[in-house]
Amino acid sequence: DAEKFPLKMADLVVTSVNPYEAPDSVVWCSDPRNVIKELPTVGLPGDYFYSPMQLQGEWSKYTETICSVDPSGRGSDETAAAYLSQKNGFIYLHEMRAYRDGYTDNTLLNILRGCQKYGVTKLVIETNFGDGIVAELFKKHLQNTKQAIDIEEVRANVRKEDRIIDAL
């Protein structure tokens, strides 16, 4: 099973994330003292979440902050938004949101409020369903809310699990 699921919980460092800045380095360590016992283990047996051993260096602004949007497809699929920043090769996940009402105005405006909260400069929108319609809807709301956010459309052509691993 370990080969089938190459992304492990232990590969992630779990800590509170500042919305605007981060340290120069986050030091990972698999010391049992760093296991976060309060978080449920949802992976393979023996796989745990760990807190950082140290946060090192100066704190400064993130290099980039994006919002990645995966619009709902068919059936019970949800629209998902992930707010991510990066600095010095580290990716910081601020928040993830999921919406059951597709890409309604309320959903898109809520996603844009999150963009404002975290200082997002780019929306990355998956175009597999709708052929770009979601990006057009976002453009309308960006204009109405006077937010200066670039939009990048991407087409996913591999399994969702593989895309997540590649992004990390």
Predicted stretch roles:
Residues 58-59, 74, 116, 144:
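Generic structural signal for beta-strand residues in well-ordered domains
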